[in-house]
Amino acid sequence: MPRTSRKRSETGFYHVILRGNGKQNLFETDKDRAAFMEAARSSFSRDSVTLIAWCLMDNHVHLIIDDPLDRISTAIQRVASTYAMYFNHTFGHSGHVFEGRYGSVPIIDDEQLLAAVKYVHNNPLKGMGITPDRYPWCSYSEYTSCLLYTSPSPRD
């Protein structure tokens, strides 16, 4: 049975989730997390995708992206394959790093966008009991102090 097509976002905004294969950790060190963010930044820049919010947990990743040109598949595939090559080389593994297809939820309006960003930023609290302001691997601090990986959307 063929799998269903992804739902396209009319707004261009998506909540993307990538999970480690077999619930394995995607990140062992901060160097691994930085490598993932570099892969995301490079791919998104190449595909005109803007990273709005993000959170890197040990075994999964949340990304809120603005993709007005509908390049989500190419962009996420490039991020995942670039990081998988890094991960497998670094840890002497082979095979899949991510579990199946990435998940994506189209965001339909500003209210849902705000809720998705809040959900992503609160993931460390929910998963590890760490408040977003104390967790360095989510974009919360970028919103409060203008740092690091995300950039303003060209639509701003």
Where are these regions (language model features)?
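Short acidic (Asp/Glu) and glycine-rich catalytic loops that position anionic groups and cofactors
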Residues: 17, 96, 148
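Basic nucleic-acid-binding interfaces
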Residues: 67-69, 74-145
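Active-site catalytic microenvironments for nucleophilic, acid-base chemistry
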Residues: 42, 86, 153
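Conserved small/polar residues in nucleotide/adenosyl-binding loops
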Residues: 149-156
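An N-terminal domain-cap segment
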Residues: 2-13, 17-58, 64-66
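Alpha-helix boundary/capping residues
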Residues: 40-43, 123, 147
